[in-house]
Amino acid sequence: MASEIHMTGPMCLIENTNGRLMVNPEALKILSAITQPVVVVAIVGLYRTGKSYLMNKLAGKKKGFSLGSTVQSHTKGIWMWCVPHPKKPGHVLVLLDTEGLGDVEKGDNQNDSWIFALAILLSSTFVYNSMGTINQQAMDQLHYVTELTHRIRSKSSPDENENEDSADFVSFFPDFVWTLRDFSLDLEADGQPITADEYLTYSLKLKKGTSEKDKTFNLPRLCIRKFFPKKKCFVFDRPVHRKKLAQLEKLHDEELDPEFVQQVADFCSYIFSNSKTKTLSGGIKVNGPRLESLVLTYVNAISSGDLPCMENAVLALAQIENSAAVQKAVAHYEQQMGQKVQLPTETLQELLDLHRDSEREAIEVFIRSSFKDVDHLFQKELAAQLEKKRDDFCKQNQEASSDRCSALLQDIFSPLEEEVKMGIYSKPGGYRLFIQKLQDLKKKYYEEPRKGIQAEEILQTYLKSKESMTDAILQTDQTLTEKEKEIEVERVKAESAQASTKMLQEIQRKNEQMMEQKERSYQEHLKQLTEKMERDRAQLLKEQERTLALKLQEQERLLKEGFQTESRKMQNEIQDLQKKMRQRRTCTIS
């Protein structure tokens, strides 16, 4: 929980040791305790460009992420600092500072590419930090963005005729913020003042031409435009004279360039107000444990030589959470039944009604806590567990009723049995007295409350066990003629047969009630599942509509700039996306 976060400083989340990426268990432990949604801001850039200073400012501290004061890169791997979000109550701000790209000591671009890819996969806002202006050198240094399709997969197995276009990435890529440090130019174009955002848009314009040089110029710009439809730019003056840069974290704001101080404040304000909660496909809000799962899945994929895959990460997360959702739903069912049920219930229907209410709530708990339940395997598992729980309650109900009725019979009929043993009814007229007493005791038994569903069966079993005793009293009663005895025997047989028929009818009725309940359970599962699928479908369409709008904007820009070929490629992507949306709108839930 946010109130329980006490990270006084950053901690290494993903270690980079000798070119190998390893997850730090202590950092995962911190993430696992964060139950609120997280806003994840990652910063990436060349080493010694002041990334850590900005991250410390976002954390509200002067110190924390190592700034270093030499040309050596200080941050290795990816470091994490979790702080309560200053503008969004109930949210946690997770700051990720990455090791500097292009560190000559590493001599391994592979490593840089993975750090870059992980920062994109884990964040909801991706900050790219560089020095000076956006020139071709700055673009060349951002070559990692052109490699993303070779570093990240959105789907575990793309369709045969479907390349992973930017639509797949746009749906889960973070917003892009470019921070330009020690920016010394005047912000203007064609003699007119422009904003930092307009400067970024201007810098991302493409060159007409088909030469290799033109392609090299255009490729990173195209990738940024396609992968990151939402872009923002901030420029920063040099904070102090070069000689004082080494003491930057020790200096007070009044010792810094006022322009720089204001620019940093504007940057922090934007991040706090505009950075979104980390969200997965389908509108799934990421909290600490979910971020922990993503970190593990991605790093394990890279370590094993695979490409980190968004779909696989979500499915791995779904396996963990859906399994927990089943247990949570079952626990809720048990809690509700424990509170509501008093065994034995008077009728089976009473128990089944309580089961139905508790089951409905349990399904609601599962539906709220689950996602990406492929083939509804976990919901089927829940249905099976709830059915078993219901059967257990039915068995307990039966046993409780049997115990209660047996105890009642003992209390009510044991005095009669004692009288029989004493020979009180072994006399002329004794049989009629015995039958009268028996009827009185049966009436008393029937009047006892909460005997449960076994009341009749236990009574009839008891009476059947005493038939020989009843017959002995009948045969020894000398006041009855043989004919009367025969009639009485037939009457007892008829009464017993009638009771047996009644019991069979009751068993049949119980079976019918159980079958009706099973059908109602199935319909309840189906109803809630259908509603969830409709919500999921609406959410996905919403995401696709957002992606479509961004693609249409980009296509319009390409047309205005005169890039017909790129515009046609974008049109193909738009048509593919529109086709998927039509299919999703018309698909039926079976």
Swiss-Prot record:
GTP binds at residues 45-52, 67-69, 97-101. It comes from the Eukaryota. GO terms for cellular component: cytoplasmic vesicle membrane; cytosol; extracellular region; Golgi membrane; plasma membrane; symbiont cell surface. A lipid is attached at C587 (S-farnesyl cysteine). Its EC number is 3.6.1.-, 3.6.5.-. It is a lipid-anchor. It catalyses: GTP + H2O = GDP + phosphate + H(+); GDP + H2O = GMP + phosphate + H(+). The modification Phosphoserine is found at S156. The modification Phosphothreonine is found at T588. One of its GO terms (biological process) is defense response to protozoan. The modification Cysteine methyl ester is found at C587. The keyword 4Fe-4S does not apply. Residues 588-590 form a propeptide. Residues 1-309 are annotated as: GTPase domain (Globular). SUPFAM superfamilies: Interferon-induced guanylate-binding protein 1 (GBP1), C-terminal domain (SSF48340), P-loop containing nucleoside triphosphate hydrolases (SSF52540). Interferon (IFN)-inducible GTPase that plays important roles in innate immunity against a diverse range of bacterial, viral and protozoan pathogens. Hydrolyzes GTP to GMP in two consecutive cleavage reactions: GTP is first hydrolyzed to GDP and then to GMP in a processive manner. Following infection, recruited to the pathogen-containing vacuoles or vacuole-escaped bacteria and promotes both inflammasome assembly and autophagy. Acts as a positive regulator of inflammasome assembly by facilitating the detection of inflammasome ligands from pathogens. Homodimer; homodimerization occurs upon GTP-binding and is required for the second hydrolysis step from GDP to GMP. Undergoes conformational changes and oligomerization upon GTP-binding and hydrolysis. Heterodimer with other family members, including GBP2, GBP3, GBP4 and GBP5. Dimerization regulates subcellular location to membranous structures. Interacts with SQSTM1. Interacts (when phosphorylated) with 14-3-3 protein sigma (SFN); leading to GBP1 retention in the cytosol and inactivation. PANTHER family: GUANYLATE BINDING PROTEIN. This is Guanylate-binding protein 1. The gene is GBP1.
